[in-house]
Amino acid sequence: MSAFVSKYEDELIKTAKYIATPGRGILAADESTETIGKRFAGINVENTESNRQAYRELLFTSPGSYPCLSGVILFEETLYQKTSDGKPFVDLLMENGVIPGIKVDKGLVDLAGTNGETTTQGLDSLGARCQQYYEAGARFAKWRAFFKIGATEPSVLSIQEDARVLARYAIICQENGLVPIVEPEVLTGGSHDIKKCAAVTETVLAAVFKALNYHHVLLEGTLLKPNMVTPGSDSPKVAPELIAEYTVTALRRTVPPAIPGIVFLSGIQREEQATLNLNAMNKLDVLKPWTLTFSFGGALQQSAIKAWAGKPENVAKAQAKFLTRCKANKDATLGKYTGWASGDSAAFENLVVIGYRY
């Protein structure tokens, strides 16, 4: 089917293409107040607005990080915050060639008729909110759906419902000038092997792109944020080269070349692990018609937040840690990462957040 023709069509295509610039990626700094609170608890920092502002300012003002980043995903609170000297975060990012984006979903609700599966809420007010976010300076958005692997999961109902919701979100964003990042995440929890994850990922992605087509979404003005294909978290680990092979194969079977970029989520992967996997994908010698880059949260921030520990005197040290991960992932998007950033023990720390619920 033909894509919807929006008055923003040219801008959407230009923005999506820019975000997918080879050698650059996205910092996902859109943790909810509850989630950032759990990360702060791990470093004994109180979860206040001023501390959240200080931490985001640390990230956004890190010297040398801008050439590694094409976009930053913000939480709604952060979209309207300013630096300590009064400059809006949005202006700071744009002046340095980094496009601001915004998380627009409203979290998960249980999907009735399933075995504990979920769907994502927030469509009712989305159009009006997108207009407000565009006026505030955001130029792309993110919406996540979760798919768990179990004996009978993900169910057909879950796949079809979340694919429909992702497509509705995407077209509403495009009608209001925001590039949609479509994020169908197959969760890593479980003891399944990599082949099972690959099969589920392919099924989910096929359903998502079918729904995007039905809803006339402009693929050239859309970005995909999928999981990497890995074994379950309770299964034996495998080499980055195998993860790369299964992930790229799943994408080649399901993702149209009209999509300009695939920006991987890192999930609960350790910093170094996520970087090595991304690097292996970009080194893989097969046709990949899209840019393969990163949209990492914890896998860009773990070393930095630990070094910061809420203390102003640690800001420069934390920024140096953040820059190290930015440069490592920049190299990985080009298939040129050599492991030079693996010396920090925090790069290998478990990123599971106990009690986490999106």
Swiss-Prot record:
Enzyme class: lyase
Site residues (Necessary for preference for fructose 1,6-bisphosphate over fructose 1-phosphate), renumbered to this chain: 358
Family of this protein: Belongs to the class I fructose-bisphosphate aldolase family.
Protein name: Fructose-bisphosphate aldolase 7, cytosolic
Localization, UniProt: Cytoplasm, Cytosol
Subunit field text: Homotetramer.
InterPro entries: Aldolase_I_AS (IPR029768), Aldolase_TIM (IPR013785), FBA_I (IPR000741)
Database matches in SUPFAM superfamilies: Aldolase
Keyword check for Lyase: yes
Organism: Arabidopsis thaliana
Superkingdom of the organism of origin: Eukaryota
Active site: 183, 225
Enzyme Commission designation: 4.1.2.13
Keywords: Acetylation, Cytoplasm, Glutathionylation, Glycolysis, Lyase, S-nitrosylation, Schiff base
N-acetylserine PTM sites in chain numbering: 2
Reactions catalysed according to its record: beta-D-fructose 1,6-bisphosphate = D-glyceraldehyde 3-phosphate + dihydroxyacetone phosphate
Job of this protein: Plays a key role in glycolysis and gluconeogenesis.
S-glutathionyl cysteine modification, residue list: 68, 173
